[in-house]
C-alpha cells in the first residue's frame, strides 16, 4: 500500500529567517500562489506574533490561498496562539503550529521549567489552538537532544489534547540518517495513541544531511516532511522540497508513499524564490540547478543522444525545464504577453497590474531584440518591489566615464516624495553611482555583497544585480535588473535601502519567554 506523503512548505517562515532573505507581504503572497500551483499540502505562511508585518503577511496569504492549507507558527503562549488564530480566521483551511523546547538543556536554561511544567504548557497550548481550528501541529523543539522517554510522554499527552500532527525537528542539524530514522520509528511504536496523529519531520542542513534525514524518517513511518524551496533557511538551510519530492517520485521501489506535488511547477517556483530573496541557485544544485541536466563528458553526451535514460534518472521536463521557449519582442501584443505570463504561472491581480507590467515590457522590448522567460520573471520581481510603499525611488542616473579619467555619477532620487540630486566620483561607474546615492541618504550602511548575473545570453542581455547591506545587526538583500548594469546596480541599492528603512520589530520564534 502506498500512503500519501504530506509536503509542508516553510519557505515563507523558516526560509525567510536566512540572513537577508526578508520578504514583503506582497512577495510572500506571490510565492504562496506559486506554492499553491505546485500543489503543496501545507504552506507555513509565517509567525504572526513576530511583528505587525508578519501578522499582515499571514493574513494576506490566508485570504488568498484556496487549495493549500495555510499554517501559522505560535509558541506555547496564549498570546501567540490567539494572534495566529486571528491571522488565519479567513483561511479556507487553517492550521496552527505550536511548539515548546523539550531537551534538558533548553528546559533548564532557556525555559527554566521542570518537565512537568513543559508538558502542562504543551497540553494547554494545543487545547487553546483547537479553539480556532481542528488542525493543530505540535513540535518538541530540539527533539534530537531530548530524552526519548520524555518525548514519548509529552507527545502522547498532546495527542490526547487534540494535536493531529506531531513534528519532530532536528533543530541544530546534528542527526544522522540511520539514527534519526530509527528514532522516528521507535516513537511511533512506543506511543500508544500514535495512530491518531501524522508524524512529521523538520530537518536542518548543518551537516548536509537534511534531505537524507528526512527521507530516512519517511522510511520509518513519517508521513509529513517540512521543507523549503531551494533548501532556503537559517544557517545551512533546510531540507530542499524539490529533492524530497523527486527522490520519492524517482525511487518508488524504495519509498512506500507518494506526493501530490505538480512537479512541472518546481523550476518556476525555484526561480521565483531565488529572484525575490536574492539567493542565487548554485549551478550544480540537484533538480533546479542550471547544470542539473547538462552533460559535458563526450561519453555521457553520446549515451544521452542515443537514449536519455542512459545518464538521466528523471526527465528535465517533468520538473519544469523546457526547451520550448517562446520569444517575445517589441511587436508582441498584450494578449501574447498575458498568455506567456500565464504559462509561466504568473497571474495578475487586476487589469491595472497587467497594464503596468506590460508597459514595463514594452520599454524593455525597445532595448532588447528578444525577450525571454527570464526577462519576464525579472520584470515581475521589479514591479513587485516597486509596488510596495517605498520611501526612496530612483528618478535619474547620469554617468561620465572616460579612459584614464575618474568616473563621475549624478543621481536624482525621491525621498518621501522630495526630490534630491547628488554627485560623486568612484573607482568605477557603479562605485560612483552608489556613492552618489549614499551621499543623499546618509544611511551609514556596510555593503557586504555585490554580485552580477546575466539573465539571458547576448550583449543586450539584462544584468541582474544583488547587493547586501548591513546596519545595526540587520541584513537585507536588494535586487535590480536592467540592460545597463550601472542602472541595475542603482536599482538594487535603492531596493535594499528601502528594506532597511522599513520599520520592523520582529520576535524570533525561538526567542522569548514562555
From Swiss-Prot:
Biological process terms from the Gene Ontology for this record are:
L-leucine biosynthetic process
Looking up SMART domains in the UniProt record yields: LeuA_dimer (SM00917)
Instruction: Name the chemical reaction catalysed here.
Output: 3-methyl-2-oxobutanoate + acetyl-CoA + H2O = (2S)-2-isopropylmalate + CoA + H(+)
The portions of this protein that span the membrane are none
Its main subcellular localisation, reduced to a broad class, is: cytoplasm
Give an example GO cellular component term for this record: cytosol
- Which positions does UniProt annotate for Mn(2+) binding? 14, 202, 204, 238
Q: Does the keyword Metal-binding apply?
A: yes
**What pathway is this protein a component of?**
Amino-acid biosynthesis; L-leucine biosynthesis; L-leucine from 3-methyl-2-oxobutanoate: step 1/4
- The annotated region (Regulatory domain) lies at 393-514
Q: Where is it localised?
A: Cytoplasm
Which Enzyme Commission numbers does its entry carry?
2.3.3.13
SUPFAM superfamilies reported for this sequence: 2-isopropylmalate synthase LeuA, allosteric (dimerisation) domain, Aldolase
A single GO molecular function, which one?
Answer: 2-isopropylmalate synthase activity
Name the keywords, alphabetized.
Answer: Amino-acid biosynthesis, Branched-chain amino acid biosynthesis, Cytoplasm, Leucine biosynthesis, Manganese, Metal-binding, Transferase
Output the InterPro entries linked to this UniProt entry: 2-IPM_HCS-like, 2-isopropylmalate_synth_dimer, AIPM/Hcit_synth_CS, Aldolase_TIM, LeuA/HCS_post-cat, LeuA_allosteric_dom_sf, LeuA_bact_synth, PYR_CT
- Is ATP-binding there in the keyword field? no
User: What are the required cofactors?
Assistant: Mn(2+)
Function per UniProt: Catalyzes the condensation of the acetyl group of acetyl-CoA with 3-methyl-2-oxobutanoate (2-ketoisovalerate) to form 3-carboxy-3-hydroxy-4-methylpentanoate (2-isopropylmalate).
Complex and partners: Homodimer.
What does the sequence similarity comment in the record state about its family?
Belongs to the alpha-IPM synthase/homocitrate synthase family. LeuA type 1 subfamily.
Name listed for the protein in its UniProt record: 2-isopropylmalate synthase
Q: Gene name?
A: leuA
Amino acid at each position: 500500500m502506498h500512503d500519501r506523503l504530506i509536503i509542508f512548505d516553510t519557505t515563507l517562515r523558516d526560509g525567510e529567517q536566512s540572513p537577508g532573505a526578508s520578504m514583503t507581504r506582497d512577495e510572500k503572497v506571490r510565492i504562496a500562489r506559486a506554492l499553491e500551483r505546485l500543489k503543496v499540502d501545507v504552506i507555513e505562511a509565517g509567525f504572526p506574533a513576530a511583528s505587525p508585518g508578519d501578522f499582515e503577511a499571514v493574513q494576506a496569504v490566508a485570504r488568498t490561498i484556496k487549495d493549500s492549507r495555510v499554517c501559522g507558527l505560535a509558541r506555547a503562549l496564549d498570546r501567540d496562539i490567539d494572534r495566529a488564530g486571528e491571522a488565519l480566521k479567513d483561511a479556507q483551511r487553517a492550521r496552527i503550529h505550536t511548539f515548546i523546547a523539550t531537551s534538558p538543556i533548553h528546559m533548564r536554561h532557556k525555559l527554566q521549567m521542570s518537565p512537568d511544567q513543559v508538558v502542562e504548557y504543551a497540553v494547554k497550548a494545543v487545547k487553546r489552538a483547537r479553539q480556532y481550528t481542528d488542525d493543530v501541529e505540535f513540535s518538541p523543539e530540539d527533539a534530537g537532544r531530548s530524552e526519548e522517554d520524555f518525548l514519548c510522554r509529552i507527545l502522547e499527552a498532546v495527542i490526547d489534547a487534540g494535536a493531529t500532527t506531531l513534528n519532530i525537528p532536528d533543530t541544530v542539524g546534528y542527526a544522522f540518517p540511520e539514527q534519526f530514522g530509527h528514532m522516528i520509528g521507535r516513537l511511533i511504536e512506543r506511543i500508544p495513541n500514535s495512530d491518531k496523529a501524522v508524524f512529521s519531520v523538520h530537518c536542518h542542513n548543518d551537516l548536509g544531511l537534511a534531505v537524507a534525514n528526512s527521507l530516512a524518517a519517511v522510511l520509518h513511518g513519517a508521513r509529513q516532511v517540512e521543507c523549503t524551496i531551494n533548501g532556503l533557511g537559517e544557517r545551512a538551510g533546510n531540507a530542499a522540497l524539490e529533492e524530497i519530492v523527486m527522490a520519492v517520485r524517482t525511487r518508488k521501489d524504495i519509498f512506500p508513499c507518494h506526493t501530490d506535488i505538480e512537479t512541472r511547477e518546481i523550476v518556476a517556483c525555484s526561480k521565483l524564490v531565488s529572484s525575490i530573496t536574492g539567493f542565487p541557485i548554485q549551478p550544480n544544485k540537484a533538480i533546479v540547478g542550471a547544470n542539473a541536466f547538462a552533460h559535458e563528458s563526450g561519453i555521457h553526451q553520446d549515451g544521452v543522444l542515443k537514449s536519455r535514460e542512459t545518464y538521466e534518472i528523471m526527465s528535465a521536463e517533468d520538473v519544469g525545464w523546457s526547451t520550448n521557449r517562446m520569444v517575445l519582442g517589441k511587436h508582441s501584443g498584450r494578449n501574447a504577453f498575458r498568455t506567456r505570463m500565464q504559462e509561466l504561472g504568473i497571474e495578475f491581480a487586476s487589469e491595472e497590474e497587467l497594464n503596468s507590467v506590460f508597459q514595463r515590457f514594452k520599454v524593455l522590448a525597445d532595448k532588447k531584440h528578444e525577450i525571454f522567460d527570464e526577462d519576464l520573471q525579472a520584470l515581475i520581481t521589479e514591479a513587485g518591489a516597486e509596488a510596495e510603499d517605498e520611501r526612496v525611488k530612483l528618478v535619474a542616473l547620469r554617468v561620465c566615464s572616460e579612459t584614464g579619467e575618474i568616473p563621475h555619477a549624478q543621481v536624482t532620487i525621491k525621498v518621501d516624495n522630495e526630490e534630491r540630486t547628488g554627485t560623486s566620483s568612484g573607482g568605477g561607474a557603479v562605485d560612483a553611482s552608489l556613492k552618489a546615492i549614499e551621499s543623499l541618504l546618509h544611511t551609514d550602511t556596510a555593503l557586504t555583497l555585490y554580485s552580477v548575473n546575466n539573465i539571458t545570453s547576448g550583449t543586450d542581455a539584462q544584468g541582474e544585480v544583488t547587493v547586501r547591506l548591513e546596519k545595526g545587526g540587520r541584513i537585507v538583500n536588494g535586487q535590480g535588473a536592467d540592460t545597463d548594469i550601472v542602472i541595475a546596480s542603482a536599482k538594487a541599492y535603492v531596493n535594499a535601502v528601502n528594506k532597511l528603512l522599513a520599520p520592523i520589530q520582529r520576535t524570533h520564534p525561538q526567542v522569548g519567554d514562555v
